[in-house]
Amino acid sequence: MNHSTGNCSSKENFSADTTADLKVEEVPEAVINTLSPRREHFTRSCSGGGPRCNRESLPGMVTQRSCVYGGARVVLMPITDAAHLVHGPVGCAACTWDIRGSRSSKSELYRMGFSTGLEEKDVVFGGEDKLLECILEINEIHSPSAIFVYSTCVSGVIGDDIAAVCRTAENKTGKWVIQVQSEGFRSFNKSLGHQLACDVILRHIIGRGDAEVRENSVNLVGEFNVAGDLWEIKGLLEKMGIHVVSSITGDSTVAEISEAHTAQLNIVQCSKSSGYIAEEMKRKYGIPYINVNFFGIKETMDSLLSISDFFDLNAEERISSMAEKTHEMIRGYRRALEGKKVAIYVGGNKAWSLIRAFRDLGMEVIMSGTQNGLPEDYLKIMEKSGRELILFDDANPVELSELLRKYRPDLVVSGAKEKYLSYKLGIPFCEFNHDRIKPFSGFGGFLNFAEEVKRTLESPIWTLASKKRLSGPGGMSGEA
């Protein structure tokens, strides 16, 4: 019996010309080998779009993200003369103590950690009495200008009426006692915590002072004085005759922020954490704002020129002279760093500003990722890069180690959580987030950054410890 059909009964039906026209598209190589639900979080910029982002982390993935409470804490904590009381288990306060790395020229109270230390019995019987007792004790011992009370997951779940306790405490102490409704479970993205903290500043602090309006006055919004960055920026502004009313929130006091509504301009350094404040102050007080970036020579120069244009200061020649002098000073660093490859894993705003900075040093960014990036962040990264690079979102330690092992950058730029992973792989690491000890903002700060990168890459340790590669999650073996 013949089972063949008329359509495909024999090879003779396929001509040589037909087979020559058959084309099979090449399957693109995966960026790294990871779980299938995570593959879209890793991409190449040449594919035309960024990675999948702004999504809940995959359960069990050991994400390196922070929570809503952590997002609120990093915005408010740099207010130097306030007490920051965490209404939750002691671990919540411990994990975020000094998390910002902010420096102060005023009070050091903000660096003290306060927690109600909720335990099992408080979950059963409630923690309101404990909270009130803690607030009264803090006020008696430290007499802060204000007390911020942070909600956490536990206090949110058990339903403590923190707002009522804060009102009672205000009546008893005469101080501002302000609830920050920052339960960690409210969102997968800490950016909600940023907005909640901004709401607290807008509703409870800004507008309560009564200072006179001064000429050429600004607020520095979204500047947290990490390692003294604020002081570098203020120095540049003062040379131009600019008066800084307040910094929101680095090296600030409650009184200074209460007078922020008297400024003539808001200059926004980190739009993701504090752009919301600038928008609301424009709506409520009519204060215009401009976005600035004081990391890198070109970015610092452009930011100062924008401020100069707003106030009609005619400072172009002075600003250009400072920028040119800085270019002259980094030439030696550029010769030493030319052609080195860099991997970046930082916040969205930092990621794209670093690309231009490394270009000034003759270095090439080959991969860039963020923990809480938005689509527009990745688009800006691609725009600033102008070349193909690996993009990734919310990478866990195993994924990050695979990226570094596969693409072998000469330098990793990230934060404390990634430092020791990089060291274990034998790759030089530069701290850019909150644990660094030198300012990187402004012209002087960029020289510090160039020196830090050069010193890191030229450390003798890398001649003694050859680069390794991970053999798996549990160990390390083999040469790169």
UniProtKB/Swiss-Prot annotation:
<keyword id="KW-0535">Nitrogen fixation</keyword>
<dbReference type="Pfam" id="PF00148">
    <property type="entry name" value="Oxidored_nitro"/>
</dbReference>
<dbReference type="GO" id="GO:0009399">
    <property type="term" value="P:nitrogen fixation"/>
</dbReference>
<protein>
    <recommendedName>
        <fullName>Nitrogenase iron-molybdenum cofactor biosynthesis protein NifE</fullName>
    </recommendedName>
</protein>
<dbReference type="GO" id="GO:0065003">
    <property type="term" value="P:protein-containing complex assembly"/>
</dbReference>
<comment type="pathway">
    <text>Cofactor biosynthesis; Fe-Mo cofactor biosynthesis.</text>
</comment>
<dbReference type="InterPro" id="IPR049939">
    <property type="entry name" value="NifE-like"/>
</dbReference>
<dbReference type="InterPro" id="IPR000318">
    <property type="entry name" value="Nase_comp1_CS"/>
</dbReference>
<dbReference type="GO" id="GO:0016163">
    <property type="term" value="F:nitrogenase activity"/>
</dbReference>
<dbReference type="InterPro" id="IPR005973">
    <property type="entry name" value="NifE"/>
</dbReference>
<dbReference type="InterPro" id="IPR000510">
    <property type="entry name" value="Nase/OxRdtase_comp1"/>
</dbReference>
<comment type="similarity">
    <text>Belongs to the NifD/NifK/NifE/NifN family.</text>
</comment>
<comment type="function">
    <text>This protein may play a role in the biosynthesis of the prosthetic group of nitrogenase (FeMo cofactor).</text>
</comment>
